[in-house]
Each structure stands twice: as C-alpha cells, then as structure tokens.
A protein has these predicted regions:
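Conserved PLP-binding catalytic core of the aspartate aminotransferase-like
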Residues: 137-205, 266-270
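PLP-dependent enzyme catalytic core of the Aspartate aminotransferase-like
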Residues: 123, 185-271
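Generic non-transmembrane alpha-helical segments
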Residues: 19, 126, 130-134, 161-169, ...
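Short, well-ordered loop/turn and helix-capping segments at boundaries between secondary-structure elements
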Residues: 62, 107, 154, 168-172, ...
Length: 271
C-alpha cells in the first residue's frame, strides 16, 4: 500500500511495482490527494501510478476539483471483488452529485485542466522557495507536488498554535505531523499548506510571494504560552499583525473572487 497525503515529494511507482512483484504482492495506491495531478498529466512516467498499480483509490474532490466523493480503479483481475464490495458500503447515490462528478471528469480531460495541474506545481514550488528565503524551514527543503510542510519548532510553536493563529488571519491550512515529531499527532510540529485552491482562483507566482510574506509575518509574530515544557494550544498573536494579515488576505480574495463575473452583492445586502 502506497500513496501520500502530506509528503512533498514524488513516489517512483515503477519501483514500487518491482518491490511488490518480488513477493507476489498486490500493489494498491491511494492517490486521493494527488489524483488531479495525475489526471492533468502533471505527474507522468514512473510518477503516475495508473500503469503500475493493481488497485487505486482516489477522491473526486481535492485536486480533482469535483464534489466530495471517491472512486476505485482496478485491473481486470480485481473487478469482481470491487463490484461486489461497493454496493455493500455505498447507498443512496445522489443524482445531482453524480452529475457534478461527470462535469469534473469532463473538465479533467481538457487542455485547460492540464494547464491548471501544471500551475499547481509551479505555484507550490514558488511558494516553497519564497518561504525558505524568509527563513521558514520546510520538510525535505521544498516540494515536487502541490503541498509543503512547514516546521514551526524553530519559532517555539507547535502546529496547533500556528494553525489557530493562521485561522485568526483568514488563512485555511492544517497542523500536521512531521518526521520524528516530538509533539505527537494532536499538537504536531508542522503546518501543511497546498496550492490547488489558490491556483483555481487564478493566483500565480506573484501572489505566492505575497502569501509567503503573510505566512511568515504570522508565524514569526505568534508567541507560545506553553510553560514548563508542557504542550499547550494557547498562544498570543500580535494584534497589529493579525489585522494586517487579515486585510491582505481580504484584498487578495477581492482580486481573485470565487465566482468571477457573478454579482454577489445581494447576499451582502441581505445580511
């Protein structure tokens, strides 16, 4: 079983196939997080699991950019088992969700989608470089895909504190364990951040530079309130930095709206 949800590099699936074959094992790949990059031909050759895996699981959301849901791909050998298993754990499929999945799959087969997948990785590499030049440490010192892991320990923080501080500033990401994490899976020592959503909005390398500035300002101006080595979720974020970060996030979102061309003022007026 191979795949990843928080690994910022690539897996050689040809090598995984060779290893599985040495012990006559089934190779199963979970590409829930990077399936959209495979569909968009941003991951090809040995980094594309489809030619090498016996069974593949994926989601229809995340990088594939469709509604929430999942799918299973398999070779002819496992077709009967998969077809028997799915009806036992899935019930009441919603027609409008099926239609939305069809739209997502259709989009994934277009040149525009392939450009989107390529730009996800370009933006991730740009954001990673911008963070590192500002002194932010990344696990594996960069990324080859759509995500990166920030190590917040050098700033005296744990992941839970840093995640909450970011949320105060209008930034959505999640705390995440890092290799040999001393803080465990609840507090963690890292932050996971990806670029699919901002790429969908139309942001590019210039915006990645600005996002890096905001992230760095929040991390460096957040102070842990942990005492005597005890883990804690409590922290203090400089109020001026919080307001400045929120304002910059708001301006970015105004420049890159979720629904460009649609007037949503009636919603604001209704509140």
């Amino acid at each position: 079983l191979t795949g990843y949800s928080a690994y910022p590099r690539l897996i050689d699936f040809k090598r995984m196939r060779e290893i599985a074959d040495t012990v006559n094992a089934v190779l199963m790949v979970d590409m829930a997080h990077f399936g959209g990059l495979v569909a968009g031909k941003a991951l090809t050759g040995v980094f594309d699991p489809v030619p090498y895996a016996d069974v593949i699981t994926a989601t229809t959301h995340k990088t594939l950019r469709g509604p929430r849901g999942g799918l299973i791909l398999c070779t002819e050998e496992f077709k009967e088992a998969v077809n028997k298993g799915c009806p036992l754990v899935i019930g009441g499929p919603l027609p409008h969700i099926l239609a939305a999945k069809a739209v997502a799959m259709t989009e994934a087969n277009t040149p525009e989608y392939r450009e989107y997948a390529k730009r996800i990785i370009e933006n991730a590499k740009g954001l990673a470089a911008s963070l590192m030049k500002r002194g932010i440490e990344l696990v594996t010192a960069g990324t080859d895909n759509h995500l990166m892991l920030i190590d917040v320990r050098p700033f005296g923080l744990n992941g839970r504190q840093a995640e909450s501080a970011m949320r105060e500033c209008g930034i959505t990401l999640n705390r995440n364990s890092i290799p040999y994490d001393p803080n465990g899976p609840w507090y963690t020592s890292g932050l996971r951040i990806g670029t699919p959503a901002v790429t969908t909005l139309g942001m590019g390398l210039e915006e990645m530079e600005e996002i890096a500035e905001v992230l760095c300002s929040v991390i460096t101006k957040t102070r842990s309130l942990s005492r005597n080595g005890k883990k804690s979720s409590k922290y203090v974020l400089d109020e001026g930095i919080r307001e400045s970060a929120r304002a910059r996030v708001q301006k970015l979102l105004e420049r890159f709206p979720v629904y460009p061309g649609i007037d949503l003022d009636f919603l604001r007026n209704a509140i």
